[in-house]
Design a protein with these regions (language model features):
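A short glycine-rich, Lys/Arg-flanked "PGG" loop and its adjoining helix->strand segment in the class I
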Residues: 85-97
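Class I (Rossmann-like) S-adenosyl-L-methionine-dependent methyltransferase catalytic domain
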Residues: 1-49, 53-63, 83-86, 100-175
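A conserved beta-strand element that flanks and buttresses the S-adenosyl-L-methionine
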Residues: 71
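Short catalytic micro-motifs in class I SAM-dependent methyltransferases
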Residues: 74-78
Length: 176
């Protein structure tokens, strides 16, 4: 099984996958956080985690061979709508038949939506943090038009509480 994590951040999820003996390629513009997490892996598990400092939007995924899953947790909010238009077909075209695209992202129903400075559609800068909030209806139609089949969808809070933040998230599992 090969998983590509888009925007791996500190690498927590990629490290978890590697501990489960799943091959994971963790892509982030900065891999310094993942390097710290990777030190917690046993030597035998280190072979399952591959770190790449790249822009996941413009990556050529055809060079990875067989890809079983793409995983995006709190990353689609960090790219522009134009980048999303490039990324989604790229994922679909490079995913194995029957492969999965797993997404967790803040939506336009999130309490932070509309707070801060509007810089483009559904995108706000609040406390020096830029977020693009996803309109779930439009996004689900877009991925269906690309060819994905929806296996699971939920949009609600209480999915990923962190300190005082209880965001409204979309969790979506798509199949090619």
């Amino acid at each position: 099984l090969k998983i590509i994590e888009l925007g791996s951040g500190n690498g927590r999820d990629s490290v978890y996958f590697a501990k489960q003996k799943l091959n994971v390629v963790a892509i982030d513009q900065s891999i310094s956080g993942v390097d710290i997490e990777k030190k917690n892996l046993l030597d035998e598990d280190n072979n399952y985690l591959h770190l790449l400092a790249k822009d996941f939007v413009y990556e050529d995924y055809s060079k990875y061979g067989s890809i079983d899953a793409f995983y995006s947790r709190f990353t689609l909010h960090s790219i522009t709508k134009i980048d999303e238009e490039i990324l989604l077909p790229n994922i679909y075209n490079n995913l194995n038949s029957g492969g999965l695209f797993c997404i967790e992202v803040r939506t336009t129903k999130d309490p932070l939506f509309g707070k801060g400075e509007l810089c483009e559609e559904n995108t706000f800068i609040n406390n020096n943090h830029k977020r693009r909030f996803i309109d779930t209806d439009k996004f689900r139609k877009k991925v269906a038009d690309i060819g994905f089949r929806e296996l699971y969808f939920v949009e609600k809070n209480n999915l990923s509480i962190y300190k005082n933040d209880n965001p409204v998230l979309m969790r979506l599992i798509l199949e090619k």
